[in-house]
């Protein structure tokens, strides 16, 4: 039986731990036959140990999305990793960051612009940066997928990260216009809350007890609202949604947002 992604070469960014959504995307993609290239930032030795837990070995490249030299050399380094003459079929952007001043119990109005702009650069602008760097080495019919969290309402403790996700949604629509010139699609997956390392830290009080309590209420309310329920400890449904977008089965879908949240975004209570 062939896998959904057999023979496809896919770059996955954003693995930090084995609780990262990106880790589960990489795992499911490999289970479906994909050949991966991974990117990581900063703690590469630690990330390498984490990625060694995947079903198959994959090259790990350093990528700081704020570093213009890293971005300028990315296509060449990827080509070296996958072999001359080969191109990518998919790119996964699972990168997000906002300084603590822009999240948690810190008042929304008190976040310094320098911190907010850094968060928006990493969480939203970098989606366009990566697309620009990699589109020239992508095959027609390819797919770029970014990770979203529904920013249509003000979320407790998320503050400026919610604003960054709103920016990401707009960036995606423009990336879709540019990617279309290469015959490539661009979409986001809006996931429900997943207990990643960062989320667990917030619930544990890393951004203050009040913020932790608010996020815990958000998680509990999500499962109650979702018509089919929501398991915040299981990232596999989200990973499968991403892999569906990376496959050939949604060839006419681009510039869009696909929800993988148990349907909670459709329900008021």
Swiss-Prot record:
One Pfam family in the UniProt entry: adh_short_C2
Molecular-function GO terms, alphabetical: enoyl-[acyl-carrier-protein] reductase (NADH) activity; fatty acid binding; NAD+ binding; trans-2-enoyl-CoA reductase (NADH) activity
A Gene Ontology term for the protein's cellular component: peptidoglycan-based cell wall
Class of enzymatic activity (EC top level): oxidoreductase
Keywords, alphabetical: Antibiotic resistance, Fatty acid biosynthesis, Fatty acid metabolism, Lipid biosynthesis, Lipid metabolism, NAD, Oxidoreductase, Phosphoprotein
Site positions per UniProt: May act as an intermediate that passes the hydride ion from NADH to the substrate: 149
Site (Transition state stabilizer): 158
Residues annotated with Phosphothreonine modification: 266
Domain of life: Bacteria
Coiled coil ranges: none
Functional pathway: Lipid metabolism; mycolic acid biosynthesis
UniProt: NAD(+) binding residues: 20-21, 64-65, 95-96, 165, 194
Modulation of this protein's activity: InhA activity is controlled via phosphorylation: phosphorylation on Thr-266 decreases InhA activity (5-fold reduction) and likely negatively regulates biosynthesis of mycolic acids and growth of the bacterium. The antitubercular pro-drug isoniazid (INH) is oxidatively activated by the catalase-peroxidase KatG and then covalently binds NAD to form an adduct that inhibits the activity of InhA. The inhibitory adduct is the isonicotinic-acyl-NADH where the isonicotinic-acyl group replaces the 4S (and not the 4R) hydrogen of NADH.
Stated consequence of mutating residue 266 to A: No effect on catalytic activity. Loss of phosphorylation. Does not alter growth of M.tuberculosis
EC number: 1.3.1.9
Entries under InterPro entries matching the protein: Enoyl-ACP_Rdtase_NADH, Mycobact_enoyl-ACP_red, NAD(P)-bd_dom_sf, SDR_fam
GO biological process, one term: response to antibiotic
Record PTM: Is phosphorylated on Thr-266 in vivo. In vitro, can be phosphorylated by multiple Ser/Thr protein kinases (STPK) such as PknA, PknB, PknE, PknH and PknL. Phosphorylation decreases enzymatic activity.
Family (UniProt): Belongs to the short-chain dehydrogenases/reductases (SDR) family. FabI subfamily.
NCBIfam families registered for this protein in UniProt: InhA (NF040631), PRK07889.1 (NF005908)
Protein's job: Enoyl-ACP reductase of the type II fatty acid syntase (FAS-II) system, which is involved in the biosynthesis of mycolic acids, a major component of mycobacterial cell walls. Catalyzes the NADH-dependent reduction of the double bond of 2-trans-enoyl-[acyl-carrier protein], an essential step in the fatty acid elongation cycle of the FAS-II pathway. Shows preference for long-chain fatty acyl thioester substrates (>C16), and can also use 2-trans-enoyl-CoAs as alternative substrates. Is the primary target of the first-line antitubercular drug isoniazid (INH) and of the second-line drug ethionamide (ETH). Overexpressed inhA confers INH and ETH resistance to M.tuberculosis. The mechanism of isoniazid action against InhA is covalent attachment of the activated form of the drug to the nicotinamide ring of NAD and binding of the INH-NAD adduct to the active site of InhA. Similarly, the ETH-NAD adduct binds InhA.
Miscellaneous: Was identified as a high-confidence drug target. Many isoniazid- and ethionamide-resistant clinical isolates contain mutations within the inhA locus. Resistance to isoniazid and ethionamide can be conferred by the single substitution of alanine for serine 94; this drug resistance seems to be directly related to a perturbation in the hydrogen-bonding network that decreases the binding of NADH and the INH-NAD adduct.
Protein name (database record): Enoyl-[acyl-carrier-protein] reductase [NADH]
